[in-house]
Amino acid sequence: MKKVWYSLLVVGLIGIGLGAGTLAYFSDTEMAPGTFTAGSLDLKVDLNSTYWKWDGQVYHHNFSEKDLNASVDYFWQLDDVKPGDSGEMTVSLHLYNNPGYLWFAVDVTEDDDNGLTEPEQEAGDTTDGAWYGELDEYIHVMIWRDDDCDNKYDFYDGCPFGCRDTFVDGNGDGSEQLLWSGYLKDISDANFNLSQYLPGGYMEACQTYCFGIYWEWTPTDTDNMAQSDSWGATLKFAVTQLNDDSNPFE
């Protein structure tokens, strides 16, 4: 307390002494604003997909890089799917402004029997209604990192199941990494940390990363248990900042 008052007293005395003469003060003031702007993570998606029918018909569904609107946009919307059908979609992900961790989740929205047809009953299907469908037990799925974004699997160890010739690329000497394979029922409500499969372990800003998803209803001589059934899911991609490695889907 004494030190404070002493400092004030010295200033006061100097002020009184200088007041006795005429003074010109020199001064120089430097100023600059200080602002805070929150950083951002902006994930955009584009899609290139193909649907091969068992009878040779081919359909395409694509959209350019954009923010998705779940009420309007869709990755696939297929009716009248039959044994022997297959499809592939390559999802291109673009992260802007900052690097981040990438996450992927499958949120199943329907798995319905839609009534029991006579062939279904003859095949032994006795359940009907919502969440009693069998379609997810017949469709194989695989997910891989499509490094060259060409909508084809450049495999090294081979394709985990049949795999249409127009889908695979090369002669087995490719290096694209297979991330998951199984049936639809096995991926239901699953989520993945896709960053662990990326160089460096995260998404760089202003880079393009492609992931392929291939599905196939095999074998073609299957029974009628899944006739008229339907299955649907919402695919979710999310990014988190590098100082937050918690799964946003848990």
UniProtKB/Swiss-Prot annotation:
Organism: Archaeoglobus fulgidus (strain ATCC 49558 / DSM 4304 / JCM 9628 / NBRC 100126 / VC-16)
Signal peptide: 1-26
Name assigned to this protein: Uncharacterized protein AF_1661
Entries under NCBIfam families matching the protein: cognate_SipW
Pfam family, one: Peptidase_M73
Keywords: Signal
InterPro entries: Peptidase_M73_camelysin (IPR022121), Signal_pept_SipW-depend-type (IPR023833)
